């Protein structure tokens, strides 16, 4: 029986994680749930899964949760704040920590889990995009086990040999017979839109993803392929891959979630329905397998599987992310922060779709790129980049 803390339990990944627990009550027990401000959903989760602890981001939400749980006779202890979240990630009897708090808020609790030597099911993109070196160093020092939840990185992980799986971020790909990692992406809803029309695309059009059901921010990131750029950065850290060992491919059907190319000419791929419960269940049960609740892939209903190289004129954000990695952690942190501001501005109809990449580049050019030495340095770069990005948005929108 694996004991589990879920950081970000009321979000999409958190709810999917609890669904896997629901399908496998004999394998997993929820010890602690950590969330932001969604008290209603947290009440439902506490009543169903009876965790020992529940943590809310702020005191007001925690007070409300405590009152509602007491009325229902729940014995779950309610806490609040970031330190409590970090404590839940490092609880002595917890085996696994699902790190699914979105954004910079997830950094310190995830790092607490790493330092406590836990098995970390990593769904928080920012951990590696902004703190890649810091996090991988901490993993090595504490002998924690990282298991990637993101569907692409999980597909790569499943397609890699065991010596690499057990030494993520440090194993030598070439020594293990790996030539390259092929990161696949759908290309988003504007894959075939004429380039001249991209400037007129609306937020609603950008959010109509052909295959995956996602939130609005990540849907826009899929349309710009910034999500693939961030995944490229994560993959470089996770798999200790050089630029020449990485390939990015457009795969419109989203059936092959990523591949690994070997020296003998073999290519191993992981296929499946586009459902996050598959990679979540894989990381939770690794090295075993459990029922995820996902329907089997029906090969007879599949159309052709097609692939193409990405066009950087269509996807300048992808190129920006690849170049930012070469500049270092300050650049990847600044790019991630700027992109959050520019995407929010696009969703608020303050800027055009094509302005996202232009403003992201502008922020990178204006930033002082000293390498961060600790998480506080990273948060400082993040805050500065957001401020520059806001000014750039206001300049363009006025």
Curated annotation (Swiss-Prot):
Where, by residue number, does the polypeptide cross the bilayer?
Answer: none
- Which UniProt keywords are present, listed alphabetically? Isoprene biosynthesis, Manganese, Metal-binding, NADP, Oxidoreductase
Which terms does the UniProt entry file under GO BP? isopentenyl diphosphate biosynthetic process, methylerythritol 4-phosphate pathway involved in terpenoid biosynthetic process
Q: Which residues take part in binding Mn(2+)?
A: 150, 152, 231
Q: Which residues are involved in binding NADPH?
A: 10-13, 36-38, 124, 126, 215
Which Pfam family would be a valid example here? Answer: DXP_redisom_C
* GO molecular function annotation: 1-deoxy-D-xylulose-5-phosphate reductoisomerase activity; manganese ion binding; NADPH binding
Q: Which SUPFAM superfamilies match?
A: 1-deoxy-D-xylulose-5-phosphate reductoisomerase, C-terminal domain, Glyceraldehyde-3-phosphate dehydrogenase-like, C-terminal domain, NAD(P)-binding Rossmann-fold domains
User: Any idea of its EC number?
Assistant: 1.1.1.267
Q: In which pathway does it act?
A: Isoprenoid biosynthesis; isopentenyl diphosphate biosynthesis via DXP pathway; isopentenyl diphosphate from 1-deoxy-D-xylulose 5-phosphate: step 1/6
Per its UniProt entry, what is the enzyme's top EC class, as one word? oxidoreductase
Q: Which reaction does it catalyse?
A: 2-C-methyl-D-erythritol 4-phosphate + NADP(+) = 1-deoxy-D-xylulose 5-phosphate + NADPH + H(+)
Summarize the protein's role.
Catalyzes the NADPH-dependent rearrangement and reduction of 1-deoxy-D-xylulose-5-phosphate (DXP) to 2-C-methyl-D-erythritol 4-phosphate (MEP).
- Which NCBIfam families does this UniProt record tie to the protein? Dxr, PRK05447.1-1, PRK12464.1
Protein name, per record: 1-deoxy-D-xylulose 5-phosphate reductoisomerase
In the UniProt record, the gene name given for this protein reads dxr
């Amino acid at each position: 029986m694996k004991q589990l803390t879920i950081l970000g339990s009321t979000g999409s990944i958190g709810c999917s994680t609890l669904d896997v627990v629901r399908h496998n009550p004999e394998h997993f027990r929820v010890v602690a749930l950590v969330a932001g401000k969604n008290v209603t959903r947290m009440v439902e989760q506490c009543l169903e899964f009876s965790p020992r602890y529940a943590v809310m981001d702020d005191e007001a939400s925690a007070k409300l949760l405590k009152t509602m749980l007491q009325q229902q006779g729940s014995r779950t202890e309610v806490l609040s704040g970031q330190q409590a979240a970090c404590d839940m990630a490092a609880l002595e009897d917890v085996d696994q920590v699902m790190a699914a708090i979105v954004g910079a808020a997830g950094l310190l609790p995830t790092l607490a889990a790493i330092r406590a030597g836990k098995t970390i099911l990593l769904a928080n993109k920012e951990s590696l995009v902004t703190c890649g070196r810091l996090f991988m160093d901490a993993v090595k020092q504490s002998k924690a086990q990282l298991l990637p939840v993101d569907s692409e990185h999980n597909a790569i992980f499943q397609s890699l040999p065991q010596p690499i799986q057990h030494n993520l971020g440090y194993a030598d790909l070439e020594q293990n017979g790996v030539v390259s990692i092929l990161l696949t992406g759908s290309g988003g809803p504007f894959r075939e839109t004429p380039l001249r029309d991209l400037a007129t695309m609306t937020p609603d059009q950008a959010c109509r993803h052909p295959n995956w059901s996602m939130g609005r921010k990540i849907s826009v990131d899929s349309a710009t392929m910034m999500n693939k750029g961030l995944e490229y950065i994560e993959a470089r850290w996770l798999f200790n891959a050089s630029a020449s060992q990485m390939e990015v491919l457009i795969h419109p059907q989203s059936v092959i979630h990523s591949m690994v190319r070997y020296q003998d000419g073999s290519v191993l791929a992981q296929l499946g329905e586009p459902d996050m419960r598959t990679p979540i269940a894989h990381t939770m049960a690794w090295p075993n397998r459990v029922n995820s609740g996902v329907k089997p892939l029906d090969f007879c209903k599949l159309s052709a599987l097609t692939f193409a190289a990405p066009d950087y004129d269509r996807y300048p954000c992808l190129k920006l992310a690849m170049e930012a990695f070469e500049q270092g952690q300050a650049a990847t942190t600044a790019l991630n922060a700027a992109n959050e501001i520019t995407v929010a501005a696009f969703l608020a109809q303050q800027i055009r779709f094509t302005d996202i990449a232009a403003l992201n580049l502008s922020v990178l050019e204006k930033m002082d790129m000293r390498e961060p030495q600790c998480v506080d340095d990273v948060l400082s770069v993040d805050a500065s980049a957001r401020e520059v990005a806001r000014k750039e948005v206001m300049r363009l929108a006025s």
